[in-house]
A protein has these predicted regions:
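Beta-strand/loop-rich accessory regions of lumenal/periplasmic or secreted enzymes
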Residues: 1-204
């Protein structure tokens, strides 16, 4: 359900899967620097670990130019030191890995700002308090699950995911899985906070 508050709109979503039951409370507050998004994940019952927590935004495929400040390659909390933090400009296709079988890929850690542009308008995501993790794909996660081969990849938009965290990937294919320090226990609530705003691209 949703309700209007003194500081903006609050939306509460109840989620349930085979592991447990959760609530996500989202608050959207207008500020001079954009809309302040605050999302709180709370475990009601069941599962005590969560693989990731974030918000996904869909934009038209025309938003293909990416800019971000963060780790300059695919990185996760247990695999990131090889990529320094720097400003990156690329296309959406460069944000996913060209695996023979399409799979989850392209996460960027330690991001403080990200933007996607169609050449006229830019949508900016800015970290508040802590850096976020960033994923940008040309299709949804649900669409990705159905893909078996590279030729199955079909662009349906630009999907920007801003995350508080994503668990590590470990080396489960040829060694140990994710180490305990790179898993996220639901012993307490998790909060994700960032700003989002829309800007006109400067005339050229």
């Amino acid at each position: 359900f949703s309700e209007k508050t003194a500081n903006g709109w609050k939306i509460i979503t109840k989620l349930r899967n085979k592991c447990g039951s959760y609530t996500v409370t989202d608050t959207y507050q207008g500020t001079e620097r954009g809309v302040l998004v605050t999302s709180v994940l709370h475990r009601v019952s069941g599962g005590r670990e969560v693989p990731r927590f974030g918000k996904c935004f869909r934009l038209d495929a025309a938003f293909d130019a990416v800019h971000y400040l963060g780790r300059c390659g695919e990185s996760y909390c247990d695999m990131k030191d090889q990529f320094p933090i720097r400003a990156v400009d690329c296309a959406v296709a460069d944000m996913v890995e060209p695996n023979l079988r399409p799979q989850e890929s392209g996460n960027r850690t330690d991001c403080t700002v990200a933007a996607v542009s169609d050449g006229k308008t830019r949508v900016v995501f800015e970290a508040v308090g802590h850096p976020f993790e960033l994923g940008i794909k040309p299709y949804t996660d649900r669409e990705l699950l159905a893909m078996k081969h590279r030729e199955d990849e079909t662009r349906t938009g630009t999907y920007v995911t801003v995350q508080a965290f994503q668990q590590g990937i470990g080396t489960g294919a040829c060694g140990p899985g994710v180490m305990p320090e790179y898993r996220y226990k639901l012993d307490s609530d998790y909060t994700l906070q960032f700003l989002v705003r829309i800007e006109d691209e400067p005339a050229r």
